[in-house]
């Protein structure tokens, strides 16, 4: 798929999800979580696409860069949204539990004090 088609596909996916979210009849309750996952995924793919377009220029920084470093800053920043606001894994767990009705992952009781939590425990 050519670069133009990839960009168009990215934009259309984001546009269709936003349109679906606006219609109350199609809301599931996990729109915010899904939007965050889609946004972080789009940022990662955009970074990869920028690298494909710029090639070796992608490693240049500041005034030496063809874009003045804007694309490079985006590339450095792109992993951050998948962490802040709850990791993508946490967002997927929320969607699974609240929207799809899947059981919660096993873990300690909510009332367990932090000091009593075991490190690296695997057999909850």
Predicted regions and their residues:
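Alpha-helical interface subdomain recognition
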Residues: 1-124
